[in-house]
A protein has these predicted regions:
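Short glycine- and Lys/Arg-enriched binding-loop motifs that mark or flank ligand-binding interfaces
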Residues: 44-46, 127, 164
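Conserved N-terminal segment of class I S-adenosyl-L-methionine
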Residues: 1-99, 103-107, 120, 194-197, ...
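Active-site acidic short loop of glycosyltransferases
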Residues: 98-102, 115, 129
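Surface-exposed loop/turn positions
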Residues: 42, 130-131
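A short His-aromatic
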Residues: 108-112
Length: 239
């Protein structure tokens, strides 16, 4: 058990406890993409549940559902929403199971972990041979970050914003970087999706209103390289 890592995760719980409107919209869009794949009879493992916002919605689609969550504070938030869910209170690196899952949801987690490639390898070992792993992360080459760089408000594309540090991000991704990490872990990316084409700052987007923001969330699906969030749908290369 890596107590330092658990302490790190507990320290950012306040973000999940208070909730975030824009993050919730992104989660809803991620779920819409997941629903494009077969759902009946699929066993699911979600790695990291945050406040439980995604879990509460996904378990209605996938009744055979388990969660890995190392933060006891996050588990408490989850249990307030779903009291009877199977939840493993361990780090991914410490999770041991004879069971293999049809789908694994690794949504907005890879940017938090110490060693992303090792984490992906761990997922590869517990997904079924033809199962799918859904991996989402913030994109440092998003349209708004490209604009910020051109305006001189962003020193480099890779530089993280204050909110990134607030929520415990260790890195930001690009489409190529996420694809490469999957490849190194023995995964093949079947599809790369974009979530939230974000041309303006978060504050400016919110001021445009809910319907506009939702439209831009959907608009970016086929142009991931410009979106605020990217999602890889991956499967094992070898089995």
């Amino acid at each position: 058990m890596n107590q330092k890592e658990i302490d790190h995760l507990e320290s950012i719980n306040s973000f999940y406890a208070k909730g975030d409107y824009m993050d919730q919209l992104s989660i809803e869009r991620e779920i819409e993409i997941i629903k494009q794949y077969p759902v009946n009879g699929k066993s699911v493992l979600e790695v990291g549940c945050g406040s439980g916002y995604s879990t509460e919605r996904l378990i209605k689609i996938f009744p055979d559902y388990e969660v890995i969550e190392p933060s006891q504070k996050n588990i408490s938030l989850l249990k307030q929403k779903i009291s009877n869910i199977i939840c493993h209170n361990v780090l991914l690196e410490d999770f041991s199971s004879k069971r293999k899952y049809d789908y694994i949801f690794f949504l907005n987690i890879i940017e938090h972990v110490e060693d992303p490639i090792e984490s992906l390898k761990a997922l590869t070992s517990i997904v079924k041979d033809e199962g799918l792993i859904f991996i989402s992360s913030p994109n440092c080459m998003s349209l708004n970050r490209r604009a910020g760089y051109k305006m001189g408000t962003l020193e480099t594309y890779e530089k993280m914003a204050p909110k990134d540090y607030e929520v415990g991000h260790r890195r930001l991704y690009t489409v190529d970087m996420l694809t490469d990490h999957c490849n190194q872990a023995g995964l093949k990316v079947l599809s790369m999706k974009g979530i939230y084409l974000k041309p303006l700052s978060e504050k400016q987007m919110i001021e445009l209103g809910d319907s506009v923001v939702r439209a831009f969330h959907a608009l970016g699906e086929e142009i991931p390289q410009y979106c605020a969030t990217i999602m890889a749908v991956a499967t094992k290369k070898y089995y």
